[in-house]
A protein has these predicted regions:
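Conserved acidic/glycine
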Residues: 2-192, 207, 396-573, 826-867
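Glycine/charged-rich beta-loop-alpha catalytic/anionic-binding loops adjacent to active sites
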Residues: 167-172, 256-271, 295-298, 356-359, ...
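Cofactor-binding active-site loop characterized by glycine-rich and histidine/acidic residues
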Residues: 172-321, 339-350, 355-357, 650-652
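Acidic, glycine-rich active-site loops and adjacent beta-strand->loop/helix elements
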Residues: 218-223, 241, 301-307, 329-335, ...
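Catalytic-face loop-and-helix region of soluble metabolic enzyme cores
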Residues: 421, 806, 815-831
């Protein structure tokens, strides 16, 4: 691709492959109305052209169409419209065709591209009408059944909320839920998809489940049910009972999240930061695109959440890459308490797709067949290379945001509160309630009233049975909540923490791993690898090991990557695994998360530490929680270059390890030397957890092979031990701290760039007969407390050295945990050394002043050792 290329118009070559079989004729007048309705919505400037072409061509057509005749007619119609567009341009533009509309884009090129988008929209409109007319009575009966199930389930959930269920502490709890009132038509989306409702409970996409994937909104219970979720699972999740599938992958450990979902049948559980589901589904679509999977993706979102930046980032990526996904944007007339007119200035919500370069249209949400036909054409288009689409659904939420919100929104029968809902709007949509209106349509189509009543009774029995079962279902054992934070660790209980305080620690008896003055941190003058080279080689070896499962995504990846870190991948023949992403960290991380859920092993790069703030929601509220919430593997590595002594100033050099200390679920590593950089990155790529690798730019060796401190830290890296451990399914270094210098008088705990300052300080102090034992944590979260405790119990003193700012730094958390088990071994007050509490400055003298210097470290350690 050339730098000056224009964006691809995905779907411009798409054509409906074959006629569909209509279940009833399509009246020509009705078809004309539907087509002109769409043109008025999306391309009003072409309204008269389309109407005129229709009126000319229809003269030789019958009054109604069957599938074959409709297919033939629409093909001729689009060709005629195209000719009409060309004729208009030739007649009106003349010599102006070559004029630049914008720099490097002439009038003829500009208008031709506009025409291509218009013709794609026309083809989709005609095909959508064909899918609508192909709907059969069997599909309609399924929709009616699932809508009925949804409404009856919602009624039970509201009753449970109001009445509550007895909890073990003698209280009452009714859970929380989001009803679907008047939005049940979404169930019809599922009949347009490839489903596998009988997949085993342990299935995941690609392993036992091979259907399409959906990301419902929090109130799209019906879509989940239509895919294969059950009323019992929905109730258990909304109540937080032990049998909920929000169990971290542990039987009987449910209740961790109130949101529903059924990943084993392709239903992605939503999250409270609502755009997360749609962006994650975009990541899953990205994985399908990369892996050439025959899989379609549906992401539902409300008009309120469509204001979020992450939703725009998702659409932007999908449009740029032509991903196989459909976004369903439901305007239900209120986002909690904020009306649509205060959310956006778009004329219709479908306009939001225009800026992203892909098709969109609007439907009436009270018509299940419109949902089905739209999803069907979106799937057909995407699966044949057309790319993404957006379906704007006009509907209304006939209830409060959640059960507790009904009175505020609709009003209480007592009149207090009175409710603020627009009564005219409410009456309009109540008259369009899809369940009774579609039921009447079924009767008009000849379905027997008794058959419908029998179905409704069956659905009532089904949800009644689920209610009985969930009532008898136990509440989760409280201690199960600690299970499965990461594959490396569970959480401690309060009792375990207290027992630790009560139990004297005998760690002073633990033998020292190194003799006093002995070190494992060796450098070489020649023949060694820089820190950067070790990381580069690890990436190349990971790509070789995992093949097409591996993908490297981030900003500016395909040319060389930041600091040229991707050149080794290209030189090793892995250029095809490098993917440039739009400049938005959130969608980069969410995409990696989706790819990981699809079975890939993505390696994500955030270019600088400060930029990670833009991806924080994606890291903390999405990737970090997946295992603990519902037991999902998320084998994703996130590389974040950062650190001082690079003269890169604020935003780039931030040390951010403390950001993640209070949000469990991620493994955080911070290698300080080439050998550990290679080993830890290799191991990170094997974990089924999100792993953040904080790699210090100042250690890369960009200054002629020297660090930002002017040191040579090059090492001869032995790649065999970690590869052997991986092959044998064993842990090598990850999760384990290392004593890198034996000492006697004081323990110095550190990580990353500071291990080299620590070693220099120890060498100086050794000449003063002060022997410092240095511990390199290597893995920060979860950290190896035991190695630190054993050392402090031997030396009696503790200093923690961090490059990051002192206030709120990770060192204080580490210190607290170490001292709980070694306090009575102390002979002096523990100390944390950190940077001064300012952002990282740009100017060399300022930056050098803020970061802990060698002289300062020597001074503090000497004082502590002599105290």
């Amino acid at each position: 691709m050339s730098q000056g290329d224009l964006p691809a118009i995905h779907g411009s070559e798409w054509r409906a492959s074959a006629p569909l079989s209509f279940t009833q004729p399509l009246l020509a007048d009705a078809a004309r109305t539907e087509v002109l309705r769409f043109i008025a919505q999306r391309h009003d400037g072409h309204l008269f052209l389309v109407a005129n072409v229709w009126d000319v061509l229809i003269e030789n057509e019958p009054a109604q169409f069957e599938g074959e005749s409709w297919h033939t007619f629409t093909t001729r119609f689009i060709e005629a419209v195209h000719r009409g567009l060309q004729a208009q341009i030739q007649a009106k533009m003349g010599q102006d065709e070559g004029v630049e509309v914008i720099p490097r884009r002439t009038m003829d090129v500009f208008l031709d591209r506009r025409a291509q988008h218009f013709l794609v929209d026309l083809r989709l409109t005609f095909r959508r009408l064909a899918h609508y007319m192909a709907v059969g009575i069997g599909q309609r009966l399924e929709w009616q059944r699932t809508m009925t199930r949804t409404r009856k389930l919602d009624a039970h959930l509201k009753t449970i909320y109001a009445d509550g269920m007895a909890t073990p502490d003698g209280g009452s709890f009714g859970g929380k839920g989001f009803r679907s009132t008047w939005q049940e038509g979404v169930v019809a989306v599922a009949t347009a998809l490839r489903r596998q409702p009988d997949a085993s409970r342990d299935a995941v996409p690609g392993k036992g489940y091979d259907g399409d994937l959906v990301a419902p909104m929090i109130r799209d219970i019906g879509l989940g049910l239509a895919m294969g979720d059950t009323p019992l699972d929905v109730m258990a999740a909304n109540l937080g009972k032990a049998g909920s599938n929000q169990n971290g992958g542990w039987d009987g450990a449910g209740g961790r999240d109130l949101h529903v979902g059924a990943w084993h049948v392709g239903v992605l559980p939503p999250t409270a930061p609502l755009p997360i589901a749609s962006v994650t589904m975009t990541g899953l679509a990205f994985a399908a695109w990369r892996q050439n999977l025959d899989r379609f993706h549906v992401a539902c979102i409300g008009e309120g959440t469509s204001s979020s930046g992450e939703f725009w980032e998702a659409m932007n990526l999908a449009g740029a890459r032509g991903l196989p996904i459909c976004y369903i944007l439901q305007n239900n007339q209120i986002a909690l308490d904020t009306p649509p007119a205060k959310q956006s200035g778009v004329e219709v919500w479908a306009d939001k797709a225009v800026a992203m370069g892909f098709p969109a249209w609007t439907i009436d949400g009270s018509d299940p067949a419109a949902w089905h036909a739209s999803a069907a054409v979106a799937r057909e288009f995407a699966m044949e290379g057309g790319g993404p689409t957006l379906i704007h659904v006009e509907t209304m939420r006939g209830c409060g945001h959640a059960h507790h919100h009904d009175d505020l929104y609709l009003g209480n029968a007592s009149g207090t509160p009175p409710g603020y809902v627009d009564r005219d709007l409410l009456a309009y949509w109540e008259a369009k309630d899809p369940i009774p209106t579609h039921r009447q349509l079924l009767l008009d189509l000849g379905v027997d009233e008794i058959a419908l009543k029998n179905m409704e009774e069956e659905e009532q029995l089904l949800v009644d049975k689920a209610l009985k079962t969930v009532t008898e279902m136990p509440w989760p054992d409280p201690e199960t909540v600690t299970k499965g934070v990461t594959t490396l660790n569970d959480a401690e209980t309060h009792k375990q923490r207290f027992d630790r305080l009560k139990t004297p620690y005998e760690g002073s008896e633990a033998p020292a791993p190194l003799a006093v003055g002995e070190t494992t941190l060796d450098y070489v003058e020649s023949g060694g690898w820089t820190y950067a080279r070790a990381i580069q080689q690890a990436m190349a070896d990971i790509a070789t090991r995992h093949g097409d499962q591996c993908v490297f995504i981030g900003e500016d990846m395909e040319v060389a990557g930041a600091f040229g870190m991707n050149m080794a991948l290209k030189n090793a023949g892995h250029a095809d695994k490098l993917v440039d992403m739009p400049l938005c960290e959130a969608v980069i991380v969410h995409t990696g998360t989706g790819a990981a859920l699809s079975g890939m092993r993505p390696m994500v790069e955030i270019q600088f530490g400060g930029f990670a703030a833009l991806g924080y929601n994606a890291l903390i509220n999405n990737a970090a929680m997946l295992r603990w919430r519902w037991g999902a593997d998320c084998p994703m590595t996130i590389r974040i270059p950062l650190g001082a002594k690079t003269r890169s100033g604020p935003f780039h050099a931030n040390m951010i390890e403390s950001w993640f200390a209070n949000d469990p679920g991620m493994v955080v590593i911070a290698p300080g030397c080439p050998q550990d950089a290679y080993d830890l990155l290799m191991e990170a790529a094997e974990l089924n957890d999100p792993v953040i690798m904080l790699e210090h730019i100042g250690l890369y060796g960009l200054g002629g092979g020297l660090t930002g401190w002017g040191q040579n830290i090059n090492q001869k890296v032995d790649t065999s031990p970690v590869q052997t451990a991986i092959d044998e399914g064993k842990r090598h270094k990850i999760g384990k701290a290392a004593v890198i210098r034996g000492g006697r008088d004081i323990t110095l705990v550190t990580w990353g760039s500071m291990i080299h300052i620590a070693k220099q300080a120890a060498d100086v102090l050794s000449s003063e007969d002060i022997e410092v034992e240095i511990i390199d944590l290597r893995t920060l979260l979860p950290f190896d407390a035991q190695t630190c405790i054993e050392s402090v119990s031997r030396t009696g003193r503790l200093v923690i050295l961090q490059e990051g700012q002192w206030n709120g730094g990770l060192g204080h958390t580490l210190q607290s945990r170490i001292l709980e088990s070694s306090f009575y071994s102390l002979e002096a007050a523990p100390v944390v050394i950190g940077a001064i509490d300012t952002p990282v400055p740009f100017s060399p003298p300022l930056e050098d002043f803020t970061v802990p210097s060698l002289d300062h470290v020597i001074e503090v350690v000497r004082f502590s050792a002599q105290s």
